[in-house]
Amino acid sequence: MEKLQEYLEIDRSWQQEFLYPLFFQEYIYTLAHDHGLNRSILYESAENLGYDNKSSSLIVKRFINRMYQQNHFIISTNGNSSNQKKFLEHNKNFDLKMISEGFAVIVEIPFSLRLVSSLEEKELVKSRNLRSIHSIFSFLEDKLSHLNYVSDILIPHPIHPEILVQALRIWVQDAPSLHLLRFFLYEYHNWNSLITPKKSIYIFSKENQRFFLFLYNFHVYKCESIFLFLRKQSSHLRSTSFGALLERTHFYGKREHLVVLFHNDFQTTLCLVKDPFIHYVRYQAKSFMASRGTPLMMNKWKYYLVNFWQSYFYFWSQPGRIDINQLSNYSFDLLGYLSSVRLNFSVVRSQMLENSFLIDIAINKFDTIVPIIPLIGSLAKAKFCNALGHPISKPVWTASSDFDIIDRFGRICKNISHYHSGSSKKKSLYRIKYILRLSCARTLARKHKSTVRAFLKRLGSELLEEFFTEEEEVLSLIFPRASSPLRRLYRERVWYLDIICINDLVNLD
């Protein structure tokens, strides 16, 4: 972002809301390669054409020169015209890919600059490690003791391209840029299928992930705007810690009594209290909204959201895409965890003068459990075990050295432990570690043409044990076991901000 601001200080065209001239600037395509989600088509296409990486700058300059040639670069919106067919031939596909990469950077400029100015006004410190996905951690840490319903919501889709263009007009007021965006979206909409037999016209693919992720996130942003409004309206108890406070369990009983007694005199004051408190989180295309209320009120919320999306944003959604369930009888997958609410019973002793009472109190506890069966299925797909979870050797890795084999198994084991460190029950991870440890031993034994028992007896099992417990020993140095409060902290859930960088097991083959 700092590098982009340096370039924009020189090029003032964006300050007059003119983004289209930026398509003719070489640094835009350089930035598209530097922080792209995937490998840039600048270098990939250069390799296909026989150039090295140093020639990519020359390719960009030639591409910009071709854009200046009005007769050479013709865009036709007619899907059946001969001009468009010629435009989408092999020689023109590279140009279209280049524009899509540049557009992905250019269209983010108004949003990025507004974000920076907003942070400066609020005097907030920017953190490069924080992402929107990290907001899920606060949702999983909440006890949800005061909520009783959860709505499983699917983000409405598909969306017509023209609606998305009209929505972007609020932020991007440059008409030529909007026309170019409209062309891209209609091309995508007309083709229907992105994967074609001919690789030469495989335009809107993973190479353009950044471009389409921006459009998708903007679409989700419009859908979520109503939840942000509701969150602000239901702001009572928002500043209170979400700990399992006993007084919290009786709050709603007191509130209902308050409404009955002072309904006529304090109607305006009670509006803030009567609003339902909600807790909202989104992961990928699904979102969850936990709230408190009756089944009738939750159904009203469902149809309100459907009508609101259709009336104001023209998003066609169906009531069946919003599933309402009781929180106590529902479990859902979120960020690789199986989350559910269970009752946690506790006994409180109350002393009144000479009499004492034992009070049983049931409080909701939000558990995040490792889904052991899907995780074993992933290990079986990666050929670390069979479908039943029995460890097997990895013949493909036997050509590597012993150190490389142990290192690859160790990285997978540490990644799984690292990713699922936020689980409230870590005992299920022991089975995963056992599968990987025994699979590593069998792979080494297969390489040396020996049995697992003979191999471990010859080298000793301490090597594997020390390697797989390295992370736990590091944590034990940070949180000494001698201290009781720190020992409890050692057992608590830990959320790492870099879990989004951990690769899938299948990609480690």
Curated annotation (Swiss-Prot):
It is found in: Plastid, Chloroplast. InterPro entries: Domain_X, Maturase_MatK, Maturase_MatK_N. Keywords: Chloroplast, mRNA processing, Plastid, RNA-binding, tRNA processing. One of its GO terms (molecular function) is RNA binding. It comes from the Eukaryota. Belongs to the intron maturase 2 family. MatK subfamily. This is Maturase K. The gene is matK.
